[in-house]
């Protein structure tokens, strides 16, 4: 199998990001964004996906974490799409239900080439998590889905603790990505012959 890897850089007035990704890795992850909770969530995602991931971001966290989180999601999604290449042979669809203490999240996705996000249950999250508004994480998932060109459904099913809910979501996303990216065949899994 061809090595499925990509490197992405992005520099704006808000963030400077450097990212390298190997899809079929060993779960070796190094993330430094200047926002500890983001580092924690992206480390979980990469580990559970089995990615080798190195991501550094110098963002305008003196404002808040919004641009850092949003751009990290976009770059990670772009790297994932690039690493998969023509997507021939992948399972394409993946899902996972992951508990974290009292919280349970379900993640379902399709590497369809048609970006879309459904994010349900976010009313369970407290208004502020790790010093930032809870809606910040919707922006991450939206940016990731757009960059990766995937149809992504995340359902926070139940739970009380915002950290636990998000941790189960990021672990679930990683596991669902691992399953969807698995090579199971030679042909492209599409009756129309295209994933766009």
Swiss-Prot record:
Main localization, broad class: cytoplasm
Root EC class: lyase
MF-aspect GO terms: imidazoleglycerol-phosphate dehydratase activity
InterPro entries: IGPD_sf (IPR038494), ImidazoleglycerolP_deHydtase (IPR000807), ImidazoleglycerP_deHydtase_CS (IPR020565), Ribosomal_Su5_D2-typ_SF (IPR020568)
Similarity field: Belongs to the imidazoleglycerol-phosphate dehydratase family.
Stated name of the protein: Imidazoleglycerol-phosphate dehydratase
Organism of origin: Oleidesulfovibrio alaskensis (strain ATCC BAA-1058 / DSM 17464 / G20) (Desulfovibrio alaskensis)
Gene assigned in the entry: hisB
Catalysed reaction, written as an equation: D-erythro-1-(imidazol-4-yl)glycerol 3-phosphate = 3-(imidazol-4-yl)-2-oxopropyl phosphate + H2O
Biological processes per GO annotation: L-histidine biosynthetic process
Keyword Lipid metabolism: no
Pathways per UniProt: Amino-acid biosynthesis; L-histidine biosynthesis; L-histidine from 5-phospho-alpha-D-ribose 1-diphosphate: step 6/9
Domain of life of the organism encoding this protein: Bacteria
Documented EC number(s): 4.2.1.19
Keyword terms of this UniProt record: Amino-acid biosynthesis, Cytoplasm, Histidine biosynthesis, Lyase
Record PROSITE patterns: IGP_DEHYDRATASE_1, IGP_DEHYDRATASE_2
NCBIfam families recorded: PRK00951.2-1, PRK00951.2-4
CDD domains listed in its UniProt record: IGPD
GO CC terms: cytoplasm
Compartment list: Cytoplasm
């Amino acid at each position: 199998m061809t090595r499925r890897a990509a490197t992405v850089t992005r520099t704006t007035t808000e963030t400077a990001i450097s990212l390298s990704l190997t899809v079929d890795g060993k779960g070796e992850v190094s993330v430094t964004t200047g926002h500890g909770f983001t580092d924690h969530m992206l480390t979980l995602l990469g580990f559970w996906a089995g990615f080798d991931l190195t991501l550094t971001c110098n963002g305008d966290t003196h404002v808040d974490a919004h641009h850092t989180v949003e751009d990290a999601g976009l770059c990670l999604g772009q790297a994932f799409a690039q690493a998969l290449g023509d997507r021939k042979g992948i399972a394409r669809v993946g899902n996972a239900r992951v508990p974290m203490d009292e919280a349970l999240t379900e993640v379902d996705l399709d590497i369809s080439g048609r970006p879309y996000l459904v994010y349900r249950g976010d009313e369970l999250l407290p208004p502020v998590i790790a010093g930032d508004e809870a809606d910040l994480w919707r922006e991450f998932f939206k940016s990731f889905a757009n960059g990766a060109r995937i149809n992504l459904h995340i359902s926070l099913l139940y739970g009380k603790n915002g950290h636990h809910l998000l941790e189960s979501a990021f672990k679930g996303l990683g596991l669902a990505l691992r399953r969807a990216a698995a090579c199971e065949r030679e042909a492209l899994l599409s009756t129309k012959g295209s994933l766009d």
